């Protein structure tokens, strides 16, 4: 194995995975999946219940801060996911709340992975606030 990829969901703070990895191995690693959804099942951490792009953008900003801060350990990140996915829960023709992994402790900020709301683009390919966060990181880091 030349490179390890890990799907890591540690709220909006993956920092300790990089520290843990560096203590375990000198092989390179990257986050093969990280992100958050744009639906708040409950109001929490000053984010309102319902569709909430601000919560998703805020958590992605925090995740990317850590990713770029630990570049000596971490080779990068694949943000999950590019677009919202209608087929993940309930009716495949409408965007539903819910899906797999309710009460997932690693999902910001409500602990619930609303599977159809993880995209940085909406179902109609409209750019969410998280898209601009990601774009901004790569524009300022290059």
Residue locations for each model-derived region?
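Extracellular glycoside hydrolase catalytic/binding regions
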Residues: 1-69
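C-terminal structured "cap/appendage" subdomains that terminate the fold
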Residues: 57-71, 80-85, 94-97
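Residue-level signal for the start and early helices of compact helical domains
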Residues: 20, 73, 109-112
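Aromatic-rich peripheral "rim/lid" segments of glycoside hydrolase catalytic domains that contact
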Residues: 80-142
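Short, solvent-exposed beta-strand-terminating loops
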Residues: 27-38, 75, 80-93
């Amino acid at each position: 194995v030349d490179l390890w990829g890990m799907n890591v969901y540690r709220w909006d703070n993956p920092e300790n995975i990089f520290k843990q990895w560096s203590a375990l191995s000198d092989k390179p690693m990257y986050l093969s999946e990280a992100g958050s959804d744009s639906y708040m099942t409950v109001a929490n951490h000053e984010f309102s219940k319902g569709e909430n792009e601000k919560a998703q953008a805020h958590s992605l900003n925090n995740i990317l801060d850590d990713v770029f801060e630990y570049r000596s350990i971490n080779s990068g990140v694949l943000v999950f996911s590019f677009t919202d996915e209608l087929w993940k829960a309930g009716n495949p023709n409408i965007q539903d709340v819910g899906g797999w992994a309710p009460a997932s402790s690693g999902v910001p900020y409500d602990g619930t992975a609303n599977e159809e709301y993880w995209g940085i683009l909406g179902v109609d390919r409209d750019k969410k606030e998280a898209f601009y966060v990601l774009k901004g990181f790569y524009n300022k880091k290059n």
